[in-house]
Amino acid sequence: MRKIVAGKLHGIHVTEANLDYHGSITLDPDHCEEAGILPMEFVEIWNKNSGARISTYVILGERGSRCCILNGAAARTCQPGDQIIVCNSIYLDEAHITSLKPRIVTFDQDNNILDRLSYSVDLDPDGRYCFSILDEADEALAIPALVSGA
């Protein structure tokens, strides 16, 4: 079993940092559903502004709020306005890698969704892996893909 990316909120902006809360990251349920992120799921958080990398669990905020709130100790690593990547993962047998289609969501400055992408791993005629980033129409983008929220 290997740890594989399952979904990402890419370039979402921190709306609040609450040091006195119990811990976690509070996210809009609409955003979580788009990327396949579950409540209480452990996620990795990568801060594009500072380079900080942490792990915490997800709690759901108010639906439609576009919130991204770092709580407890995590609040020390991300400040309001920071652009972060929230990534969930699964453990998967390599034989099933071609059936996984991670969902990636990108955001504007106000945490409105810009792009809905997916990752795809396929086998070429020689049995080697090939990787694609697909847009909403399942069209492959150039790699590295320069999408509006990247």
Curated annotation (Swiss-Prot):
Chain residues that bind substrate = T56, G72, A73, A74
Presence of keyword Lyase: yes
Biological pathway: Cofactor biosynthesis; (R)-pantothenate biosynthesis; beta-alanine from L-aspartate: step 1/1
Keyword list, A-Z: Autocatalytic cleavage, Cytoplasm, Decarboxylase, Lyase, Pantothenate biosynthesis, Plasmid, Pyruvate, Schiff base, Zymogen
One GO cellular component term: cytosol
Enzyme Commission number, as recorded: 4.1.1.11
Q: What InterPro entries does this protein map onto? A: Asp_de-COase-like_dom_sf, Asp_decarbox
Q: Which note does the record give on the cofactor? A: Binds 1 pyruvoyl group covalently per subunit.
Which compartments does it reside in?
Cytoplasm
Spell out the post-translational modification annotation for this entry.
Is synthesized initially as an inactive proenzyme, which is activated by self-cleavage at a specific serine bond to produce a beta-subunit with a hydroxyl group at its C-terminus and an alpha-subunit with a pyruvoyl group at its N-terminus.
Q: Which reaction does it catalyse?
A: L-aspartate + H(+) = beta-alanine + CO2
Pyruvic acid (Ser) modifications at: S24
Answer yes or no on keyword Oxidoreductase: no
Gene3D superfamilies to which the protein is assigned, alphabetical? 2.40.40.20
Q: Which cofactor does it need?
A: pyruvate
Taxonomically, the superkingdom here is Bacteria
Q: Which GO terms describe its molecular function?
A: aspartate 1-decarboxylase activity
User: What is its biological role?
Assistant: Catalyzes the pyruvoyl-dependent decarboxylation of aspartate to produce beta-alanine.
Q: How does it assemble?
A: Heterooctamer of four alpha and four beta subunits.
Under the heading PANTHER family, the entry gives: ASPARTATE 1-DECARBOXYLASE
The entry's family comment says: Belongs to the PanD family.
Can you name this protein?
A: Aspartate 1-decarboxylase 2
Q: Which organism is it from?
A: Mesorhizobium japonicum (strain LMG 29417 / CECT 9101 / MAFF 303099) (Mesorhizobium loti (strain MAFF 303099))
Which gene carries the instructions for this protein?
panD2
